[in-house]
Amino acid sequence: MANEREQNHPTIYLFTDGASSGNPGPGGYGIVLKCAGIEKEISGGFSLTTNNRMELMAVIIGLEAIKWKNARVEVYSDSSYVVKALNEDWLATWERRGFTKVKNVDLWTRFIPLYRSHNVTFHWIKGHAGHPENERCDALAVAAGAGAIKNGIALPEDSGYKEEQNKIL
């Protein structure tokens, strides 16, 4: 019965963007969640990270913000990296191969159970093309990353990025 009720929730629209000033550099993510006339914005940043990490982090944080199980979620992202990983089955291949030679494994393994707990569809949208939610997510991401640094706000370390770099060195 509870599962029936959960499936009757309205669709959640998740708009995401990630940014870094330099690649790597200070970076941030921006999220706009919309559902049944309600809108929520989320953002955060790190002192040293990459744009791809922030693009994926935006989706992860957005999915973590959803409290329903089995929610219908439409994700809109300008990240080919994230969208193609799902829509072109890159993620399934990476997982099958044990994530050998794959970057951002810490984030992908955090993403997988979130993705599987909902009914998620990914849509690629062109960035910086006047899409209002994408433009807002971009502004949130830039403000949370490079903008915070410019304003003297100390950002946390992206420990996953640091660990990945230590493996390479």
Task: Please tell me what each predicted stretch does.
Residues 1-2, 128:
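N-terminal hydrophobic targeting segments
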Residues 16-26, 60-136, 140, 145, ...:
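RNase H catalytic domain
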